[in-house]
Structures are given as structure tokens and as C-alpha cells.
Amino acid sequence: MLKIDTAAACQTVITTFECSPGTCADLMEKLQSAYRDFISHQPGFVAAGLHVNDAQTRIANYSQWARREDFQAMLRSEEMRERNREIAGLSTRFEPVMYEVTGVF
């Protein structure tokens, strides 16, 4: 379960995906499959959430990892590299960015 906390000793990653309404459902299915079958089982994975906008042109992913290195190792794995090629084919752009939580209200 996601817990947003400034005192948490974890790495936060927010990834935004741009897509079309025609590919949004397929992209969401690929992302859910990746989290269910692979990402959530990787060392250091804490939690994640997927969000889609009303127009179905953007998907936002919020994930937490024990350490930055855990997230990077998952990205570099052969399975995730293959999955990311499929994800890239369904999105016009996606960008993972690492963040630090500085306030919770």
C-alpha cells in the first residue's frame, strides 16, 4: 500500500506516459501486467499506483522503491527492457523521474 511520508526512507518515482485514446486501454493493460507479474516481485519494490486522465491521453504511475539502485536494477533487467519496448510502442512518450517527498498535507 502506498504511503506518502517525508520521513520515509524510500525512492519515489513518478512516470508519465502520453498516449492516444485508442491506445490507452492497451497501454494500461501492459502496465498492469508488468506490475502484477514482474515489477512488484522485484527486490526493493514497495508499492505503486496507476492513474489515467479523463481524456485517456495520459497515464501517471507513482511508485516507491527501497533504494534508487533497486529501481535502476529493475529497469535494466532483460524482462523489463523487453516490456518497455512494447510499452514504448503504445505511447508517444514516457519519462520516469526520481523524486524526494518534501511535504505532505
Predicted features by range, described:
Residues 1-11, 18, 49-60, 84-105:
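Glycine-rich beta-strand-turn "strand-cap" elements at beta-sheet edges
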Residues 18-31:
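Short, surface-exposed ligand-recognition loops at beta-strand->loop->(often short) alpha-helix junctions
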Residues 23-25, 69-71, 104:
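Residue-level signal for secondary-structure boundary sites
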Residues 16-21, 63-65:
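Short beta-strand-to-loop capping motifs
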Residues 21, 55-57, 67-69:
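Short, charged/polar surface micro-motifs in flexible loops or helix N-caps
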